[in-house]
Amino acid sequence: MEPVSMDKPFMYFDEIDDELEYEPESVNETPKKLPHQGQLKLLLGELFFLSKLQRHGILDGSTIVYIGSAPGTHIKYLRDHFMSMGLVIKWMLIDGRTHDPILEGLRDVILITKFVDEAYIRQLKKQLYPSRVILISDVRSKRGQKEPTTQDLLSNYSLQNIMVSVLKPAASSLKWRCPFPDQWIKDFYVPHGNEMLQPFAPSYSAEMRLLSIYSGTPIRLKCITQQDSSKYEKKMYYLNKIIRNRIIINFDYSNQEYDFFHMYHMLKTVYSNKSFTSNKSKVLHFHQSIFRFLKIPITNTEKIHHEPTQRKVPSKNTMLKSRNTKKSVRGNKQGRRT
């Protein structure tokens, strides 16, 4: 891992300031993974998104329709957090797979075991009227293989476009990963939105969340081309290969790895009904409560490889001035492209 100073993480795709040509051999690297990392990634992104809606006065009184929600373990944390803030929210969780039993028996949570298609979305629209809808989509292919094909992605994005156009949500968070240029089939459309980057995504994941707040005007779509695909691949590879393998030395926190730095800046935007002396103490509270909920061990900064062994210093009170130089130190590299 490379020790560097950074003022803030890249929160959105358009902030990534460099590119790197994709190296296929990266798929052979051993990924570094936390327990329940997928649920952690979803929880942080959705907590950030819903807190933004809370700030805009959109969340209270809404119905959150979450399509592709199973197993949804992390949703219990979100539900409990916003309930503790006094917000009235209904949750409608829809997936053809089984949900975590932790979500059963909650009077404000409806569990529906069903894979969604256009006909069902239109039926759902009638059921939801006149509710204010917040849409979260984590749809993925029903195929057996682990990685979706380009055709799977195009089908998913077509279905998400239907969700947005039919349900007319006040806001949405959609799953979004551009197909890779060497697997390109055709140009396609997605809604306009902010492309949010995700801490604790798999090591070489190019997946983002497409966040939108709608103002009642017609939904605007943008065309994605193969040229765009090349840009997405190079920028996301740079993010994963270079940026996410950094230790942020000016980040005053127990774990200075980049993903924790990214998480910190997300969690500091979250509201709480508790009083804290600083942003750091608030973030630490949420960090620890989320990790406890998901049963993830609390870790400190990973030791940098080739770090010199510390030696005893003479008892004489001497100090060396910092030479303020930056050294590139290589450490564990991560995973695979998804």
Curated annotation (Swiss-Prot):
Domain of life: Viruses
Keywords: Elongation factor, Methyltransferase, mRNA capping, mRNA processing, Protein biosynthesis, S-adenosyl-L-methionine, Transcription, Transferase, Virion
Disordered: region residues: 305-338
Biological process annotations from GO: 7-methylguanosine mRNA capping; methylation; regulation of mRNA 3'-end processing
One term under GO cellular component: virion component
Gene designation: OPG102
Biological function: Displays methyltransferase, positive regulation of the poly(A) polymerase and transcription elongation activities. Involved in the modification of both mRNA ends and in intermediate and late gene positive transcription elongation. At the mRNAs 5' end, methylates the ribose 2' OH group of the first transcribed nucleotide, thereby producing a 2'-O-methylpurine cap. At the 3' end, functions as a processivity factor which stimulates the activity of the viral poly(A) polymerase OPG063 that creates mRNA's poly(A) tail.
Protein name from the UniProt record: Cap-specific mRNA (nucleoside-2'-O-)-methyltransferase
Enzyme class: transferase
Compartment(s) of residence: Virion
Skewed-composition ranges (Basic residues): 323-338
